[in-house]
Amino acid sequence: MNTDNASLYVKWLKQEVAPALGCTEPVAISFAAAYAAQYLDQPCTKISGFISANLYKNAMGVTIPGTTVCGVPLAAAIGAFGGDPQKGLKTLEDITPQHVEMAQKLIANNAVDIAVEETPDFIHLDLTLSAGDNCCRVVVKGTHTNVVELYINGQPQPLSEKQNTRTQRETLPTFSLQQAYDFINRVDFNDIRFILDAARLNSALAAEGKTKKYGLNINGTFSDAVKNGLMSNDLLSKVIINTVAASDARMGGAPVVAMSNFGSGNQGITATMPVVVVAEHLGVDEETLARALSLSHLTAISIHSRYTRLSALCAASTAAMGAAAGMAWLFTRDINTINTAIINMISDITGMICDGASNSCAMKVSSVVSSAFKAVLMAMQNSCAGANDGIVCADVEQTINNLCRLVIKPMTLTDKEIISIMVAK
């Protein structure tokens, strides 16, 4: 295949499928605070600034990794005392209970004041950390670790080439599902072998989620239902339980890294675990799994790149469309089955809202992976939502564009109302 095109898809995968510790919105706040703290010569005594409304929505209610606490002020303060900005989305990997205690004391002293503001960028943080006579201000926007401005004691500082390389994402052209399908069928296995890390990391997270009650423990509820004969111990149940176990752990603050997709751990989990479970069921080799995972993650990327990084739409739903593509490919290798499965999913779960990251996200994950599996089964029987059914049409690309049109236009008002409700709580 064209090596330039192959390079594009590998770039997309390496850029958007990345390890992350904890829900990425509170981690982004911790990262910004940690980034500023490294320029202070003593522990910070004050944190101030603002974050975008969408960032607030996804940071206020989810457990901060390695802790049992949540909240925007705590995310900032914990990052300031224990974060390592060199680790990007894994910035909280080395925090300790002492860091949490220091953060709680700072908040108790009313020394953390972070406002919520409407900004053009859905991801926007502007934090200033002070210690003694010194202060450092950091501005992050566009993506979770994209540092665009740095000020020390009010003076702007140049961002080094190393800093820019670490934090900025390359703007890459979008692509169709057919192009992704062609790529994963033709690419050399060694060029995509790295995607197996997604299976390794997210499977480890799922295993952690089964060790104790994280979040709402939805995987435990379903596992008990299987034991008690209320659910079947079939492939669908295994897909749901293993995917939700990782999401439970993720949202419940497990100190275990996830492989994310498009800046979201839950999206990475959703695009990975159903494919892993089906691959294990079919007994395929690593190369086949790598191709299926690449298709799943590329499909999720192709869809999400057509709408905003944060929105009123639950993005686990579009990540699950990637999982549907990966599962359909494992079962059939047929592009028409893949396209049909995605059309079926859009007919099924369009409109599931994102009302912020929280433990209940795992419930949404269980819903979307169930929809994905159902859509694949229907597609394998040549059963497809009709072109006259709502927003779907015969062409999968146009159907995806119709979905994204809803997200970009009318659902922006939905998003504002959701945030308004949450801020008023």
Curated annotation (Swiss-Prot):
Pfam families: SDH_alpha. GO terms for biological process: L-cysteine catabolic process to pyruvate. InterPro entries: Ser_deHydtase-like_asu (IPR005130), UPF0597 (IPR021144). One of its GO terms (molecular function) is L-cysteine desulfhydrase activity. Belongs to the UPF0597 family. This is UPF0597 protein KPN78578_43500.
